[in-house]
Structures are given as C-alpha cells and as structure tokens.
Amino acid sequence: SPTQWLVDLHGTLLLGPMGPLVLGVPAVLFIVALVSGAVIYGPFARKAGFAKVRGGRTTRTAWLDLHNMLGAVILAWMLVVGATGLINTWGASIIRFWQMSELSTYAAQGTPPTGRTAPIDTIVDAARARYPDFQPYFVAYPGSLMAGERFHAVYLRGPDGLKEHIFQPVLIDSVTARVIGAPRPPWYISALALSQPLHFGDYGGLTLKVIWALLDLTTIAVLVSGLILTVSKGRKGPHDSLAEVAA
C-alpha cells in the first residue's frame, strides 16, 4: 500500500537491511547541526532576546531570523526526534547484541528439537500465566533473531503507561511449553522500545499525531530556510555569516 511504501522509505530508504545504517549518518549530522546551531544562536539570544525577529533589515536577514526563531522554538523536539530516530536505526544491531549477550545464556536450556512443537496457543497461555495482567504482542519462533534454538519467546506488553510500550519476554520450551525464564529487558532494549512510539508520536492518539505533523512542517520550514540562506550566501564567508547573526 502507499502508506507502507512511505513507512519503508522513511525507515530503510528502500535499501533493505542496510537502509537503517545508511539513515544513521544523516541522523548524526542532523543532531550535530542542531547542537552547533544552538551554540551559534546563544550569544544572539542573550543580546537581542529569545526568538527575536529583527525588522527593517535585508531579505536575507529576515530569512535568517525566521530560521533561528523557528529552530529555537522547536529545538528540544527536533533533538528528541533526531535522537530517537538515531536509536531506531540501530534497532537490529541492539537486538542482535541482546541476543548474543543475554538470551544466549538460555541457549542450552529447553528440550532439544524433535521436529514437533507444542501448540502455539499452549505456548502463549504459558507466558500469560506468568504475567496475568500483560497482553501478548508477538511471538518469536525458534531460530529467529529474538528467540533461541530450543524455545519460543513470547513478548508481552503491560496494561498501561510506559509498561504498554516496554516488552517483557517469556521464554517457553518449544516442546514441553514449560517456562524457561523471563529475563528483564536491559535498559538499551527498553530505550529502543520507548524510542519507536516517541519518534512517530504514538503516545497520545490522534491529538499527538496532529501536533507531531505540525512540528514536522515547522522542521521542514527550518530546513528550507537553511537551504535558502546557504544558496543566498554568495561570497559571504563563515565569519561574515556569524557577524550577521550577532548584528
């Protein structure tokens, strides 16, 4: 569908598994640009006032003040979205590290594969019995990235609040449907789980999505005004541009 195509474009650039790693580069540059811009804008804000737009100046100065004003107002939001986007680009690597460092400690547990597994409903019921207030979100099958060779991993979500976005895995013996363990997710897995809905504005329903869309449009305005300033700079050097900010 067109929506899924846009999601894939945003998340992978349609490049497959390498896409998120490629996207990590502009994410880092975006954060660096925000931090350096805040450092440059700081002296001007102390002198003229926060989000000040000067009147009676050149068109380029008007664009500069618009760029600075919009960027200063939504700086914190852009940093949050940039940082969570960067975390998301590392998602597969983070999960793989978790599998090798912590899930691997359960690798030898469980019944060796016999070609027959317990019914999936029985496996899910065993996980829910461990956490009655939680709801199943997805099941990772043996041999997949988020499970082991001898066990299914049932990932549960809490009933409300932050627990709704943090997964709790329950490892179930694939043959006997016995609970092998329920390791608490480490901080970096929780950070990944929380960053995904925060990046896309999924915490507050439609209202937050509308706010996120407006902030996205404002960010586009910041980027466009920055491009206009770069193109119109002409022969001005970096020292001239800094002087124009402070003028």
Predicted regions and their residues:
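Conserved histidines in hydrophobic membrane contexts and catalytic metal-binding motifs
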Residues: 1-247
